[in-house]
Every structure is written in structure tokens, then in C-alpha cells.
């Protein structure tokens, strides 16, 4: 398997209903699975992903502050098989991250 790819697994375990929306007005936010975080702070915000996610856990992040410096912090888990945080460098970005496994970590869906 190549980095950034994954084989089929049941990722549908947390698909019941819509995510709970949380308006972020601070520079830091600890994320919970099943939540959508809308970044509205005048300064860049960092959303830190859960430290011990289960396969199928998901987090939405939506940029609403028109900045290109907001960050999704990996909190010890990979994002798309990379051991690095993700900068949301689009002022209109909206991303969903779903946890796959310990090797791949969080994937963009």
C-alpha cells in the first residue's frame, strides 16, 4: 500500500446524523469526534484532533475567518500518513477528517 492510500474498512460507524456545530472564537480548540468546528476568530485558530481516536471517528473544520494560517494539529496521530500538522491555506476551506488507523491516521474525505 502506498502512503496516502488505504484499503477498504468499515468507516460507517459514526455516520448517524449531522455533526454538532461549534463556533470557534479563540485561537485554540480541542476537537471531539462528531463535531464541526467553524473558525471565526480574527486571528488564526488551531483545532487539535483527538489524541485517541477510533477508526471511523470524524471531525469537520470550516474556515470562516478568511485566513490562510489556520491549523489542524495532529495530536500525535498521522494526517494522510504524514507526521505533521495541516495548515488550512485556503480562506474558504472546509474539510472532513476521518480516522482510519494508526499508520494512516486521519484521512481527508
State where each predicted segment sits.
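Tight coil/turn sites that cap or link beta-strands
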Residues: 3, 34-35, 90-94
